[in-house]
Amino acid sequence: MRLGHRLGFLSVAAVLPLSAAAQPTPKAALLALSKQDHTLSIIDPASLRVVARIPVGDDPHEVIASADGRTAYVSNYGFGAFHTLAVIDLVAQKQLPFIDLGALRGPHGLAFVDGKVWFTAEAAKAIGSYNPATGKIDWIMGTGQNRTHMIYVFPGAQRILTTNVNSGTVTILDHTKGPAGAPAAPPPGRAPLPGPPGGDWNETVIPVGHGSEGFDVSPDGKEAWVANAGDGTISVIDLASKSVVATIDADVPGANRLKFTPDGRRVLVTAGTLVVLDAATRTVVKRLADVRGTGGILMQPDGARAYVACSPVGYVAVIDLKTLAMAGHVDVAGPDGLAWAVRP
């Protein structure tokens, strides 16, 4: 489905009661969290209208959708105090029971890869995965880093990257293959239990800059770019050598999110305003002063638009990626996390 039709400047208030489900969820939907109202807005990207708002619990920060586009998962962060993921049925437009993460407190960054929900747990200095098919957390790995905040999981889940804000580092976890362990001895009269999975995880911790938070992996999988909020710089990591190969003095103090465009040509950074860089030359090409108080960034899959959460001014800005100009906005109170939900 192509969503990148030309649009004029459009502002949509779309004030709906939480109980209203006046319109069905579109097959391709934009999801936007409101940290102020503690809700998830389901937005039709064709009309930029909010079709539903659904409660998601306290302090929602990040959102991700399942591969089939039917379910959304939201991290209830609480700066380390909370330990739940909210679950939303996007078709029925209703909240489902929370996922209790137990001691894995401070969930924040999310990814949905290989049928599982991957999450960071800041207060536990760990990451984990939740399997919706079994309803269980099936994997946990400590990082040993302070404020493990955002996560990127490669297809196949054999490589995982995280940013660790207070440590000023990036963690790369690589899975090495090996034979499975021997089965455990079964109780009398029962079948043998499966042995532990083979292989191991190797961790590489890469120092970057102060306040490393927002990051993204280039579409070709060769580089990771990291926004360092404390330094106002961007670190470029070569993922083959696992080393920093460039530090860009982009003048982006407070930068908290960074995303590549789908074609890999540009990089968008939120740092009070929206900053656009050329990925090849690693230079700033534009600063959009009218996109204010910026937070989460989401790319439209066809590369026509970007969506930027502007929390202090209460809307999600729509950016035309051809003109690099703001083309409209959708009113969402205190927006932050953004995601796509696409049903076949």
Indicate residue ranges for each PLM-predicted region.
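Predominantly soluble domains enriched in secretory-pathway, periplasmic, or organellar proteins
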Residues: 13, 18-344
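Bacterial N-terminal signal peptides that target proteins for export
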Residues: 1-9
